Curated annotation (Swiss-Prot):
Residues binding substrate, per UniProt: 31-34, 85-88, 97-100, 124
Reactions this protein catalyses: aldehydo-D-ribose 5-phosphate = D-ribulose 5-phosphate
Organism: Haloarcula marismortui (strain ATCC 43049 / DSM 3752 / JCM 8966 / VKM B-1809) (Halobacterium marismortui)
Active site: 106 (proton acceptor)
TM ranges: none
UniProt-recorded name of the protein: Ribose-5-phosphate isomerase A
């Protein structure tokens, strides 16, 4: 598992992406420590008079947005102009997400946005995706999905909770399998294979979705614009 980068790098990336938020827009609010800096920066802009509405991707981001005074809406009621979200790993513009077990809701919101900005620190960059892919599964399908993932060449592990007995349970009431495929040279093919498995709610491969990558360092931010 990758260790997280410095708080300064995360803050730089989050605040850089938040600067892209314009007045009278709807913003998808991502999950994780780097996205949290973007949410706080948006909250400060709201305090200064910026007119935005947020669509949170998790219980965590909803609570933080409320604390920051950002008005919220459900995806059923608005269209998302811009989404800002973090990543567990970034390679060639593709992502692995789901370290916070919120990747199903994140993918729905991020995919619906007109523009999707990824915020990360340098420790999340890689030449090839290799981070274990989180796969959210229906509880009754855990065993069958484990077998299917193994047939695809993966090594699935049920994610255990750290502060309670038993497994992690997602905001949707499901379980998470962390599936190690070693180096993923064809993320699009693997994404298609995982999505086709009965019982899989969503996987953490975000392929061809990002429009910009904001990578923060202690000295500044590098912004890469991607072509789709």
């Amino acid at each position: 598992m990758k260790q997280g980068g410095s708080d300064a790098a995360k803050q730089a990336a989050g605040e850089s992406a938040a600067e892209a938020v314009e007045d009278a827009t709807v913003v998808g609010l991502g999950t994780g420590s780097t996205a949290a800096y973007a949410i706080r920066a948006i909250g400060q802009a709201v305090d200064a008079g910026l007119d935005v509405v947020g669509v949170p991707t998790s219980f965590q981001s909803r609570q933080l947005a409320r604390d920051c005074g950002i008005p919220l809406a459900d995806l059923d009621d608005v269209s998302v102009d811009l989404a800002i979200d973090g990543a567990d790993e970034v390679a060639s513009g593709n992502l692995i997400k789901g370290g916070g077990a919120a990747h199903a809701r994140e993918k729905i919101v991020d995919a619906s946005a007109d523009r999707f900005l990824v915020v990360a620190d340098p420790t999340k960059e890689a030449a090839v995706l290799s981070y274990p892919v989180p796969v959210e599964v229906l509880p009754m399908a855990r065993s069958t999905v484990v077998t299917a993932v193994e047939e695809l060449g993966g090594d699935p592990t049920l994610r255990r909770a750290e502060r309670k007995d038993g497994p992690v349970v997602t905001d949707n009431g499901n379980l998470v399998l962390d599936c190690d495929f070693n180096s993923i040279h064809d993320p699009a093919a693997l994404a298609s294979d995982l999505a086709a498995l009965p019982g899989v709610v969503e996987h953490g491969l975000f392929v061809g979705m990002a429009d910009e990558i904001h990578v923060g360092t202690a000295d500044g931010v590098t912004v890469r614009t991607l072509s789709k």
